[in-house]
From Swiss-Prot:
This is Guanine nucleotide-binding protein alpha-14 subunit. SMART domains: G_alpha. The keyword Magnesium applies. GO terms for cellular component: cytoplasm; heterotrimeric G-protein complex. It comes from Caenorhabditis briggsae. The gene is gpa-14.
Length: 408
């Protein structure tokens, strides 16, 4: 059973490029024993994919150079579902034109419709995982499924929210689903679930077009290279998000050896989650599997990725900005889930101050001793927070050693 087909109804797996019969990405429910059943074949495919992606990245960077000329390059990297693309969208809102054209707004309206449909399906599935019966909601589920059942999970060409707003609102407000939501760390669920489902009446209006807050809460897997150029205090910055690159980083990271700054984003709630994306990360890199096992918490995977990236020769001269993201969700989760299962050496009270300091220290120690690393705690969906943090970050970067940054 492979989750990319069960949950999304896809013809091929975007993670390993196989069809249903040959997919190598195990479902969360599997024991992981099949993880490397076809490792040689997977590695061969990834080598070809890495070469293709390297050429695509190189072409994209060359086009940027021709178009924008000289600039300081900022690379966005990070752990699974950490908010990399959300940070990128915030930069577009704060420092560029944002999202204002009718075409952009209509596209995001469709994506938001899709995200709401995904959250509904995830909540129904999550109820089974945590053992909460939805029998009393059978009528509501039936009414919602009449609209949603014929549609693929990622289909957003048809607007459906106006047709389900009443039963979906009742579904969300039910005692059973609120109990399921409290245990959301036990199954896959979009971070934007609460935000969207509490705004259904507004989103369902016939003249609805998303605002910037709606847009930054939207979620779509990054499958391409995105870049943006903007001016900051008279300096031209090129920000590149390569979150959609699925092949081994060492095979394309050298293309960014001129990056002056790396923003590495960490999902703080990852200490309590073992997501499909983490398992996919492990399936691509056997050395990760050997070091931390196939059932690692997302934060352990992020820590290993950071250790790998921070030690890369290609980024030896880059300043690293650590964005410990989703502070708001992290604070909500702390009373329910201890940090100790993820980090066995943590033995203090599970307070925000204690846990955030412990996590921050873990990541800073994972970098080389002389590496310039500046930690910041963020809520990527909060535009004012990101504006303030980015200002502080750039002040740190501009003050950093001129040999390391090349910015003096």
């Amino acid at each position: 059973m492979f989750s990319c087909f069960n949950n999304l109804g896809l013809d091929y797996c975007y993670q390993c490029m196989h069809g249903p019969e040959g997919c190598m990405v195990p479902s969360r429910q599997g024991d992981g024993g099949e993880l490397y059943a076809h490792s040689e074949e997977l590695e061969a495919k990834l080598r070809g994919l890495a070469k293709k992606e390297s050429l695509e990245i190189e072409k994209s960077l060359e086009n940027d150079k021709k178009t924008y000329g000289s600039h300081i390059k900022i690379l966005i990297l990070g752990g699974p579902s950490s908010g990399k693309s959300t940070i990128f969208k915030q930069m577009q809102i704060i420092h560029s034109n944002g999202f204002k054209t009718e075409q952009e707004l209509i596209q995001y309206r469709g994506l938001i419709d899709t995200n709401i449909r995904q959250t509904y399906r995830q909540l129904v599935s999550g109820a089974r995982v945590v053992g909460i019966s939805l029998e009393s909601l059978e009528s509501l589920v039936h009414d919602i499924n009449k609209v949603y059942a014929p549609m693929a999970a990622d289909e957003f060409s048809i607007r459906t929210i106006p047709d389900v707003v009443e039963p979906l609102t009742a579904f969300w407000n039910s005692r059973e689903i609120q109990e399921v939501y409290k245990r959301r760390y036990e199954f896959e669920l979009l971070d934007s679930t609460k935000y969207y489902l509490e705004n259904l009446n507004r989103i369902s209006k016939s003249d609805y077009l998303p605002n910037e807050e709606d847009i930054v809460h939207s979620r779509k897997a990054t499958v391409s290279i995105n870049s943006i150029v903007f001016q900051y205090t008279g300096v031209s910055l090129l920000m590149v998000d390569v979150g959609g690159q699925r092949s081994e980083r060492k095979k394309w990271l050298h293309l960014f050896d001129d990056a002056k700054v790396v923003i590495f984003v960490i999902d703080l709630t990852g200490y309590a989650k073992k997501s499909e994306e983490s398992r996919t990360e492990l399936s691509r890199f056997p050395n990760f599997f050997n070091e931390i096992g196939n059932d690692a918490f997302d934060m352990k995977v992020a820590l290993k990725i950071f250790n790998d990236v921070a030690g890369s020769h290609a980024l030896a001269n880059a300043v690293f900005l650590l964005f410990f993201n989703k502070v708001d969700l992290f604070k909500e989760l702390l009373p329910q889930v201890s940090l100790q299962p993820c980090f066995s050496k943590f033995a203090e009270e599970n307070s925000y101050d204690n846990t955030s300091k412990f996590i921050c220290d873990k990541f800073i120690r994972a970098a080389k001793p002389k590496k310039s690393v500046f930690p910041h705690f963020t809520t990527a969906t909060n535009t004012e927070n990101i504006k303030m943090v980015f200002r502080a970050c750039m002040e740190s970067v501009f003050k950093a050693n001129s040999k390391a940054t090349g910015l003096s």
